[in-house]
A protein has these predicted regions:
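Transmembrane-helix signature of 12-pass secondary carriers
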Residues: 1-464
Length: 464
């Protein structure tokens, strides 16, 4: 058999990189990205409820809402990413996903039954820790099982599925339940990690063979890779010979390597870009766009309808188009293109609120915004995971993406202040911040100073 003949001469990464894209690998990608979707559905849930429930009830004011966002989209996620990243590199990707998913669901659930500011902050803060853990681990797992020549196609197609699922999970129940039955809405969001992700991870995902290999569990890594090879051969026929001899063995690596001579530059660059992007294009928009739309007169139903359309059409279509490019276009260029498209969408949202004020116009603007924002976000996820070697990949992703979530901590303070200060002139402070330092600047930095990743073996890129 081809697998047995090649096993003594090929490393685990080389054998993974020659696997064809069959249902064997698609299944792993779809499960990890379904995990991303069900936990992100709980992320910033306060921003979907406050404009239509807690705000009109005067449960707490806009300043307290900003603090709630600071904890539930910032502090909690940062703490979770760092904590679960360490667990992931020590105990494995699969075990960490199970623990983080349970934390997310159990933490979010009480938010459907209280409107006290402090109890909400505690509940959503704990849930956010689980979100951070899943974010830090899902991307790493997907990067480690995706073959290098098809990494872009596999990751971005799986991510397009995740965006479609996220749009349906957050918007369709919102159309049917918000604001009258918001408690049921929260319960549905919390049920996703507990009743969907936990069983999928427990019964479908094997442990990452790359993680097993670098942690000395060679027999387990061999068993997982052999199983994947057998399944792929059954579906696609004999496997091609792996490319050997071009990848140098990885040396022992620690967290200190993130700041050592080899990785310091890329770590600092990712710190800066995630910090700016999370403060603006991601959590600046997530935290305050719904509030802006409510202030200019859009109903909850209109906001959730536009969210469903933009998520299904915009986000998924953008990533599917990028997946067709596979690894033929440098990832840095795709990140920049995503930021430019998102900025165009934000300008159109502003014009919709100030001039056109119609659901069709809002939906078109939101489609363009989501297409660009998700293109930027998911390519940044993949770029970050691929930038580090396997032994520190989870910690590297967790540290850089986690530090970037400091942007989600400062975002409610900066964006919230600009939002309030420029309310009389169309909230242009909000739009100006999320467009310039929050989207364009980080994309330009990656395009100018980032490393090349196009179609390169994972170990070669990480060690470059």
């Amino acid at each position: 058999m081809l697998t047995d003949a090649l096993a003594p001469r090929a490393t685990i990464p080389q054998r993974l990189d020659r696997l064809p894209l069959t249902w064997t690998l698609w299944r792993l990608g779809l499960v990890t990205q379904a995990g991303w979707a069900v936990v992100v559905a709980t992320d910033a849930i306060a921003a979907r409820i406050y404009p239509f429930v807690w705000g009109p009830r005067h449960a707490f004011d806009t300043a307290a809402f900003s603090i709630l966002l600071l904890v539930s989209t910032g502090v909690g996620i940062v703490a979770g990413e760092y904590f679960f990243a360490v667990l992931s590199d020590r105990f494995g990707r699969r075990t960490t996903l199970l623990a983080a998913a349970a934390t997310c669901g159990l933490g979010t659930l009480p938010a459907g039954f209280v409107d006290d500011f402090w109890l909400l902050t505690l509940s959503l803060g704990i849930g956010a820790m689980g979100i951070g853990g899943v974010l830090a681990t899902c991307t790493v797992y997907l990067a480690e099982v995706a073959p290098s020549q098809a990494r872009g196609r596999m990751t971005q197609t799986s991510q397009a599925f995740a965006i479609f699922l996220l749009a349906v999970l957050t918007s369709l129940p919102g159309i049917l339940l918000m604001p009258e039955h918001y408690q049921a809405y929260v319960v549905l969001m919390a049920a996703g990690p507990l009743l969907v992700l936990v069983p999928l991870v427990a019964f479908v995902l094997p442990e990452s063979p790359r993680w097993l290999d670098v942690h000395g569990r060679h027999e387990q890594a061999e068993a997982v890779v052999s199983m994947l090879e057998r399944d792929c051969e059954t579906r696609a026929g004999p496997l091609p010979a792996p490319i050997t001899g071009d990848v140098a063995p990885q040396s022992q690596a620690t967290v200190r390597d993130l700041f050592g001579p080899e990785y310091r530059r890329r770590t600092v660059l990712l710190f800066a870009c995630w910090l700016l992007g999370y403060s603006g294009l991601v959590y600046g928009v997530i935290g305050f766009l719904n509030l802006y739309l409510a202030r200019v007169g859009f109903s909850a139903r209109a906001v959730f309808i536009s969210g469903l359309i933009s998520g299904v059409v915009g986000g998924a279509a953008g990533l599917l188009a990028a997946a067709r490019l596979n690894e033929r276009v440098e990832r840095r260029a795709v990140i920049l293109a995503g930021a430019l498209v998102a900025c165009l969408g934000l300008v159109l949202v502003f014009l919709t609120g100030e001039v056109w004020h119609s659901l069709p116009a809002l939906s078109i603007a939101a489609v363009i915004l989501n297409a660009g924002a998700y293109l930027w976000l998911f390519n940044m996820y993949t770029y970050t995971a691929v930038a580090y070697p396997t032994r520190i990949r989870s910690v590297g992703t967790g540290w850089t993406d986690g530090f970037g979530h400091v942007g989600s901590i400062v975002s409610p303070l900066i964006v919230g202040a600009l939002f309030t200060a420029t309310a009389h002139v169309g909230y242009i402070g909000f739009f100006g911040y999320v467009i310039i330092p929050g989207a364009l600047l980080p994309a330009l930095l990656i395009a100018r100073f980032g490393i090349k990743q196009k179609a390169a073996p994972l170990e070669t890129v990480a060690g470059a």
